[in-house]
Amino acid sequence: MSSIRKKSSGRYEARYRDPSGRSRGKTFATKKAAQDFLDRTGVDIGDRAWRDPALAKVLLSEYTTWWLENRPELRPRTHELYEGLLRLHIEPYLGECRFELLTTAAVRTWHAGLLRAGKPGPVTVAKAYRLLRTILNDAVEDGLLARNPCSIRGAGIEHSPERPVATIVEVYRLADAIEKRYRLMVLLATFCGLRLGELLALRRDRVNLVNGRIEVTEQRQELSGGTRYYGPPKTAAGVRSVALPPHLVAEVEQHLSAWVPPELDAFLFTGPKTASLRRATFDTAWNRARSAVGLDHLHFHDLRHTGNTLAASTGASTKELMARMGHASARAALIYQHASEDRDAVIAAKLSALTEEALKGSVEP
């Protein structure tokens, strides 16, 4: 129910009840302006598009701060990523914008400005856009927006360049060049597809040489300040059992004997002075090794990409590759399919055959 009342000042007060039943009012210079406002408000309420005028004055930075503080489900590394994206790439440009002014045009101007500046790179811009879109989806649910203004087609898609693939000979050159205590990390990343975080969390009791399998159940992440924490792998698919290629069995046995304490929960990979390998320590060793063999362009994660490519060349199916590498993509299509451990062992054996063939007659530079 709405009404218009002429005030002693000569202005007209339009009054109405919001969807919660609360009485609200707004004054206008003319009766027609007041009636037009009530007509528009009535339509908005009927279409469920009405928004509390007080919420429209909220600054984006106020909401993003509250939003991040109320996401206890985020992993520490993800929380750190989001905090950095907000602090560096979103709030300096849009933080002082009130929700009533947060339009598609404003978002488009912000997005175009980041791309035009060239820093950060397009991948980071896509991450920032996706985060803003996620936050504003929640703002719609919380009643601050009628619709999400993040509607730029393709803006959240990361167009990363194709990563390089190392040859088997190059992998072994890297393994030979790196410090001996890290040699097995290079080989497991390549031939078992383990991520760096999964390698850093790997313990003695997760390696079964009798069955020739490695059980991946956790990963270790390290924040920018050096804080380390352990948790489940990146996705549910990351929890997996990976067949060990036969040609790596002797490598694993030698590593366990030389570098790993006898306790079942002992980490497979440690630093020279600590029981837990710091990321910076390994990065230094990795950078030295790749420079020594002329592969400065190769990142450690490229070894996992290399292993995926090699496994695919053995004839492994998509679902078998997903199971071996711990990929979560396309899971909906594969929900009723199960990768066979026997088939994974076949893939591992073929990887060994590929390795033996590639190393046969190879000459060190």
Language model: regions and residue ranges:
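N-terminal core-binding DNA-recognition domain of tyrosine site-specific recombinases/integrases
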Residues: 3, 23-29, 56, 68-149, ...
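Basic, Lys/Arg- and aromatic-enriched nucleic-acid-binding interface segment
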Residues: 10, 122-130, 141-202, 209-210, ...
